[in-house]
């Protein structure tokens, strides 16, 4: 069964998790990594089960912790080609590898 949770949504940050068979994907990382971990724990999700992060776009309220997530976990961050093109400066600012 698929489990999901809205970890937060709004102008201050956005993040969602989807889990199936103890494997998860994180959609957006608009909070600090510490806040994301806390929100996951508070909602009964395991941070270590995250396989990858998918970003809807590169505004900070969706991608704030993307660079930190990638560097600390070594896991992939996926961004659509259109978002990459439109957000070249944001990729640098967010330090996404």
Regions found by a protein language model. Give the residues of each.
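Short, well-ordered coil/turn elements that cap or connect secondary structure elements
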Residues: 1, 72, 93-96
């Amino acid at each position: 069964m698929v489990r999901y949770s809205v970890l937060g949504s709004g102008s201050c940050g956005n993040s969602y998790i989807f889990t199936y068979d103890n494997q998860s994907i994180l959609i957006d990382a608009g909070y600090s990594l510490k806040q994301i971990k806390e929100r996951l724990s508070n909602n009964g999700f395991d941070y270590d089960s995250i396989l990858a992060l998918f970003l809807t776009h590169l505004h900070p309220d969706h991608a704030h912790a993307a660079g930190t997530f990638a560097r600390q976990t070594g896991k992939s961050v996926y961004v659509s080609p259109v978002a990459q093109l439109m957000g070249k400066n944001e990729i640098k600012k967010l330090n996404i590898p």
